[in-house]
Structures are given as C-alpha cells and as structure tokens.
Amino acid sequence: KKAGVPVVPGAVVKAEKDIDKAVKKIGLPLIAKPDNGVGAAATFKLETPEDVDHFKAEWDGHTEYFFEKFVTSSEICTFDGLVDRDGNIVFSTTFDYAYTPLDLMLYKMDNSYYVLKEMDQKLRQYGEAIVKAFGMKERFFHIEFFREGDDYIAIEYNNRPAGGFTIDVYNYAHSFDLYRGYAALVAGEPFPDSEFEPLYCLATSRRANAAYALSEEEVLAKYQHQFRVKKEMPAAFAELQGDYLYMLTTPSREEL
C-alpha cells in the first residue's frame, strides 16, 4: 500500500480473540492463510459464520494467520526476479497461473503455469515499486497479483523465488543459468545477460494415479520439439501440485 499499489484489506490473527475482530473489520467472504507458508497449503475460504466456526475448530491456536478480503478474480500473475547488493533489480520476469493456488488445493487440479515473453508495463511498475518499498538486497523476490481487467491487486510478497522447479522454468524461458547468475552476484561479479530472445515456457504437471486422454508417451511424442525436461515433484509439493512436472518452450503464444 505504501508503494502505491492496490491491495485488499487484511489483518494478522495471532490469537482466537483476533478472529472475530478480523472478520468484523474485513467482512465475509475472506481468505485465511498462514502468515508464513507456500502456495495455498492450510488455506481456508470463509464465506459464512459456520465457516468461521470451522476455522476456529481446525486452527491449532499457534500458527499465525493472515485474513484478507476474498477477490473473485481467477487470474493470478507474478512479478519475479532478483536484486543485487544495492537493491537494484538485475533480473525480472512474469508468469501466469492456469489455476489459482486455492483451486489447486480445493479441487486437486494439475498445476500449470507459463512464463511470458513480455511483461505488461503496469505490472512492471507495480512490481518495481513494491521491491523498492521493501528495500531488500541480494535476494530473490516473488510477488503475486490478481489481474482485474487492465489493473492488478497485490496478493503477497515473498523474499524467495517461486516454489518447486520455477527457477528452471525461468532458465528455459530466458536461455540462461539463473543459479550461476545468482552466484556471480553474491561473489561481486557482473550479473550475466542472456544472449537470446525470451521464449514462452510452460510448466505443467501430471498425477501418477490419474487417468488422462493421452499417455505420457503420446504427449511427449506430440510435443517432442517443444519438450525440455521432466521433473519428479518432491513429496512436499506432490499432493498439491502433481507428481511430475514437464517443461516445454515455444516462441509462439498461439502454440502455447
């Protein structure tokens, strides 16, 4: 908010007495999520007083939660990147989620997201303003936004890369090694530039126990020229996001 970026009202819940205060302040429906967490794990959507009572019954009473107004938009995008020791952004990119993290958790969908070749200027302006306001140095950042028409609403700011294998997705999209780039930055060396035009990079998952119209072999044969790598998801992410992650690149939005 201090950065001049649209946000939804929210409140931190540390004790049971804070719950009713937060509900009264923000109003239903709202989202309750751990103040320190990844994705939509342990997240609750509270629409009715009964939902609030259910949260009270399920909550361990110790984990701090953040309550925020529910936004109806189903479009979530990011402003991600890396800042150097002076706080200057040396790398930035953006990706769109095919499904919201909350829908992934509620409906056990297959996780899919894609890095874009170009970034909307307003999203870039908002993201850069947020990074400047936090004043972090020599860190990755991962900022999520709801897209509302031609505007954006900031959801959360993280002093880390996006989860899972997302750095690998960035690398395939931008044709360089962000791991080496970060090491160079920490060592005081110049951050390397990519010599190639960015590509779209799709990361999409499959579940081991789900039935699909096409087998893995058929999918990989169909997209053999776009396919880059298959990763086995760590157990911590598999239940929420799927067991296997596939990365594919293309220069064409239509093909994506």
Residue ranges of each PLM-predicted region?
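Active-site nucleotide/adenylate-binding loops and adjacent lid/helix of ATP-dependent enzymes
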Residues: 2-73, 84-88, 113-125, 129
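Short, flexible turn/loop "capping" segments at secondary-structure junctions
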Residues: 34-36, 104, 237-242
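ATP-dependent carboxylate-activation loops
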Residues: 160-181
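Phosphate-binding core of ATP-grasp and ATP-grasp-like enzymes
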Residues: 58-64, 70-113, 121-153, 158-167, ...
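Peripheral (often C-terminal) accessory segments that flank ATP-dependent C-N-forming ligase machineries
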Residues: 19, 181-256
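Short secondary-structure junctions
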Residues: 5, 135-136, 222-225
